[in-house]
Every structure is written in structure tokens, then in C-alpha cells.
């Protein structure tokens, strides 16, 4: 027997024409955590960051998430529709955000911020990477509350019948993503940053971890209706995750190789 989906009104409350939604609140929670955690990290001795720099980057980062997420969704998942309806890019009221697009937006923000502040791109990336997973966790919970991005049909005991997913029970894949891409990845990064690490390695762990978790969970997530599976076996989410896996692994190997070479020179 399938579990009953806990139907929650996506709108928390409304004041006149203004509605406050759970999904928007989740974005706010993710941003608030990032601000708190970043300031906490910046306050540590020799962090190389000031409170003002944290605030400046978070502004750039927020723009990167929003603009990159929206542009990425339109280009990756709705490209054909966008070609016929270019103004769809600005129809944010119709929803649609891509984490992979948001990642590209944040990477762009990292590069711009590092260049304008005369900081190392790798060090900025390492500082930013641990801020992301809690935002992912909150965002996926928002997806679950909205009853969207559900999983494939399943008979597991915890499968649910989603309001927009037809009569069959499905994997609550949003919760899988919240757990692995959010909580587990956050804990991995917290363990990893307890010790000094080579420049670029923290960002590498994030890219590798997220890409791997997302690639695997895509097997439980319903493919996008307008795209389906490419070659009948791989989803768009998996295609976009592969560069993250390869890039993260490559960055990790390069970072530790550089650290080893520096140690050998000093020795």
C-alpha cells in the first residue's frame, strides 16, 4: 500500500495580491544559512575573508543562482519551446529552475568576484562550496511540498501517489535528493574542511559528490516529459551531471598533485 502524500498548500499566506510560498521560503532559508555559515567561516583566524566580502559575494552568488538557474532550465529543458517563445525566459511565474544552470551561475560569480577582489578562484570556490548543500536540501523539500519533480513508478513501501503524478505510486525522489545532495553532502564537506586541504579540493569534493548523487538518483526520478531519455537510457540530469563528476575528480587529482609537488620542493 502506498503512503498518502501529505498535501500542503504551497502558499503559506497571502496579503492582497502578494502570496508567500513555501518554495520561496526554502530559497530564503538556504540563503540565510549560507550567510550565517559564511560569516562563521570568515571569522576564523587567517580565513582571508571579511564580513563585507562575504556580503558582497553572497549578492553575486544569489544573482548567479537565480539567473543561471532560470537560463539553464530554459536552455536545458525547454529549448524548443524557448525558440518559438523567447519571452518564456522571463515567465518566472510559470516556474522552472535548473540546479546545473545555477551552478554555472555561481561559478561565474566566483570567477568575477575572485577577479575583482584579487583572490584565487580556487580559494573562493573552496569557501563557497560548503554553503551550497543546505540550500539544495531546502529547495528539494520545497519541490516535495509543491508535489513536483516526483519519481518513477514504484512498489516500495514508502512510494507515494502524487497529486499531479497520476494514480500510480512513485518514488519520493525529491526526498532522496534532499537527503543525499543536501544532508549527506553537507556532512561530507564538514568532515573534509576540518583539516587544511589543497586549494581547489573542497570545490572538487562538492562537484564530484553532487554529480555522483544526482546521477544515481536520476534512476529513481521521472524523466522530464518533454525530453524523456536520450538513447533510451540516460536523462538530461545525468548528462549534465557527468561534467561535474569528471571535473570534480579532475580538480581533486590536480589539487593533491600540486600540493605533493610543493611539498617535494620544500623538502
Swiss-Prot record:
Record lineage: Bacteria, Pseudomonadati, Pseudomonadota, Gammaproteobacteria, Alteromonadales
UniProt key word Transmembrane helix: yes
InterPro entries: Lgt
Transmembrane feature ranges: 18-38, 57-77, 95-115, 173-193, 200-220, 233-253
PROSITE patterns given in the database record: LGT
Biological process according to GO: lipoprotein biosynthetic process
Keywords, ordered alphabetically: Cell inner membrane, Cell membrane, Membrane, Transferase, Transmembrane, Transmembrane helix
One annotated GO molecular function: phosphatidylglycerol-prolipoprotein diacylglyceryl transferase activity
EC id: 2.5.1.145
Known function: Catalyzes the transfer of the diacylglyceryl group from phosphatidylglycerol to the sulfhydryl group of the N-terminal cysteine of a prolipoprotein, the first step in the formation of mature lipoproteins.
Pathway: Protein modification; lipoprotein biosynthesis (diacylglyceryl transfer)
Membrane topology (UniProt): Multi-pass membrane protein
Entry superkingdom: Bacteria
Family: Belongs to the Lgt family.
One of the record's GO cellular component terms: plasma membrane
Protein's UniProt name: Phosphatidylglycerol--prolipoprotein diacylglyceryl transferase
Record's subcellular location: Cell inner membrane
Residue positions binding a 1,2-diacyl-sn-glycero-3-phospho-(1'-sn-glycerol): 140
Amino acid at each position: 500500500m502506498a503512503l498518502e502524500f501529505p498535501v500542503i498548500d504551497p502558499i503559506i499566506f497571502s496579503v492582497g495580491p502578494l502570496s508567500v510560498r513555501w518554495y520561496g521560503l526554502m530559497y530564503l532559508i538556504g540563503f540565510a544559512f549560507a550567510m550565517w555559515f559564511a560569516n562563521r567561516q570568515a571569522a576564523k583566524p587567517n580565513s582571508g575573508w571579511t564580513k563585507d566580502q562575504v556580503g558582497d559575494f553572497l549578492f553575486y552568488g544569489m544573482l548567479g543562482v537565480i539567473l543561471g538557474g532560470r537560463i539553464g532550465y530554459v536552455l536545458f529543458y525547454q529549448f524548443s519551446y524557448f525558440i518559438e517563445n523567447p519571452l518564456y525566459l522571463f515567465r518566472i511565474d510559470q516556474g522552472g529552475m535548473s540546479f546545473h544552470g545555477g551552478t554555472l551561475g555561481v561559478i561565474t560569480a566566483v570567477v568575477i568576484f575572485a577577479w575583482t577582489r584579487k583572490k584565487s578562484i580556487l580559494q573562493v570556490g573552496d569557501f563557497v562550496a560548503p554553503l551550497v548543500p543546505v540550500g539544495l536540501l531546502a529547495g528539494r523539500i520545497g519541490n516535495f511540498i509543491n508535489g513536483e519533480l516526483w519519481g518513477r513508478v514504484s512498489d516500495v513501501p514508502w512510494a507515494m501517489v502524487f497529486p499531479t503524478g497520476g494514480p500510480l505510486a512513485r518514488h519520493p525522489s525529491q526526498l532522496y535528493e534532499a537527503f543525499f545532495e543536501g544532508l549527506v553532502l553537507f556532512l561530507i564537506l564538514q568532515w573534509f574542511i576540518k583539516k587544511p586541504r589543497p586549494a581547489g579540493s573542497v570545490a572538487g569534493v562538492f562537484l564530484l559528490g553532487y554529480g555522483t548523487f544526482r546521477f544515481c538518483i536520476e534512476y529513481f526520478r521521472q524523466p522530464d516529459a518533454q525530453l524523456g531519455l536520450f538513447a533510451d537510457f540516460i536523462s538530461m540530469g545525468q548528462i549534465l551531471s557527468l561534467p561535474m563528476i569528471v571535473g570534480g575528480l579532475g580538480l581533486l587529482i590536480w589539487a593533491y598533485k600540486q600540493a605533493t609537488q610543493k611539498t617535494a620542493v620544500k623538502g
